[in-house]
């Protein structure tokens, strides 16, 4: 079977109504990562997800990026067939401000939001992110 094209993937996923699987917090809409993962597995069970990171001071590869000020971003990529999309997010507090030296729980929560947002780059729930890039 032929690998799906970006247009085919977008055509399938962008038509799915995610509205019953979102939650509003602090002025932003969040899509349930577990529900989003289930949809992706229903349609593309062979998708690949990877985390990018950097070497720490001991030479160990970490799946986060730590900036000189102590803030952290997570970066992931999702590949379906030959189509890859990437997304990144800073680890933030409830005010949507980057956290200095975040704990493992904050990093884990951000990773789940990051891959869910990466799914939006394929079409799943893309419309819930409209306007988040507009300055306040």
Question: Predicted regions: what is each one?
Answer:
Residues 1-38, 135:
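N-terminal, Lys/Arg- and Ser/Thr-rich interaction peptides
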Residues 31, 36-136:
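Positively charged, aromatic-enriched nucleic acid-contacting surfaces
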């Amino acid at each position: 079977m032929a690998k799906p094209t970006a247009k085919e993937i977008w055509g399938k996923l962008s038509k799915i109504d995610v509205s019953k699987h979102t939650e509003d917090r602090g002025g932003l809409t969040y899509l349930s990562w577990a529900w989003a993962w289930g949809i992706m597995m229903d349609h593309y069970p062979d998708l690949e997800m990877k985390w990018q990171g950097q070497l720490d001071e001991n030479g160990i590869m970490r799946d986060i990026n730590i900036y000189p000020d102590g803030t952290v971003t997570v970066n992931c990529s999702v590949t379906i067939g030959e189509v890859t999309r990437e997304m990144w997010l800073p680890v933030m507090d409830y005010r949507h401000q980057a956290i200095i030296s975040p704990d493992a729980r904050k990093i884990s929560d951000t990773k789940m939001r990051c891959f869910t947002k990466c799914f939006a780059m394929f079409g799943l729930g893309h419309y819930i992110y409209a306007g988040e890039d507009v300055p306040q």
